[in-house]
Each structure stands twice: as structure tokens, then as C-alpha cells.
């Protein structure tokens, strides 16, 4: 079971709670243990501040992933971690890349959840594995390959 804490720290329009839950559950289905995670939706100012604080980059990025570093046996529900998603960046990227907004939201939530599970895209072989899983999960939702028109990974973090 997934315990999802969705924090809407901005008034900007974003998908409904059910969509976030559906995307998270899809990305996390390989995990057999119960999970607890938070998704915080933020404006550009908070996104920039967090990206600067944790990544030393002075701009707002689309999604930041903060995997929990807590042994599973310390909590009743294993804490998976937190995602921070900057709503204006998601909207701008979808528009600039000519992607359907819902598909881009689904991609970024799935991408962030995979980071919480330990996937990464620093090395080429890791990126290929992660992107293949993203493509597979998004296809199950009826969304196109998010990397089809890209020479490189479009995720900016």
C-alpha cells in the first residue's frame, strides 16, 4: 500500500490527487513493501531555492528527488522519500517540447519515483535502463515515448 502525502504549496493548476496516486503506484509496483512518500508541488521561487540549496544550481528544475535514508525496520511504513515538483517548469517544458501536459506530468512523477527506488541516469547504462522502464510504464498509460525526439535525456536534474 502507498501512503501518499500530496502538498500543494502553489495555487498553480496541477493534476488531481488520483492522477498522482496512479502514476506513483505504477512506478512503485515492483516494490512489494508498503511505502510512504511525499510529493510537494511548488512555485518557481521555492523550486529555485531548493535546487540551489541541494544541487548548487541557481534555477528551478522540474523535479527533485530526495530518497529517504532510513532503515525500513525503524518505521511501521517504510519511508521511500520525497519529490518536489515545480509546476511552472513542468508547464513550460511541456509547451516548449510540444508534449501533452498530462503525459509530461506522468513522466516526471514516474521518473522521480524511480529515483526514489534507486534508479539513476548518471552513467549511460543506468540511463538506458531507467529510460527503458519509463517508456514501458508511460506506454501502459497510453503516453508516447518522452525521449522520441530527444538526442539526450530531457530531464534537467
Swiss-Prot record:
GO MF, one example: metalloendopeptidase activity
Cofactor info, note text: Binds 1 zinc ion.
Entry-linked InterPro entries: MetalPrtase_cat_dom_sf_prd, YbeY, YbeY_CS
Cofactor(s) annotated in UniProt: Zn(2+)
Keyword Zinc listed: yes
Binding positions (Zn(2+)): 111, 115, 121
Keyword Coiled coil carried by entry: no
Source superkingdom: Bacteria
A GO biological-process term: rRNA processing
Chief subcellular location: cytoplasm
GO cellular component: cytoplasm
Annotated keywords: Cytoplasm, Endonuclease, Hydrolase, Metal-binding, Nuclease, Ribosome biogenesis, rRNA processing, Zinc
Enzyme Commission numbers on file: 3.1.-.-
Subcellular location(s) per record: Cytoplasm
Recorded family membership: Belongs to the endoribonuclease YbeY family.
NCBIfam families with a match to the protein in the record: rRNA maturation RNase YbeY
Record's function text: Single strand-specific metallo-endoribonuclease involved in late-stage 70S ribosome quality control and in maturation of the 3' terminus of the 16S rRNA.
PANTHER family for the chain: ENDORIBONUCLEASE YBEY, CHLOROPLASTIC
UniProt-recorded name of the protein: Endoribonuclease YbeY
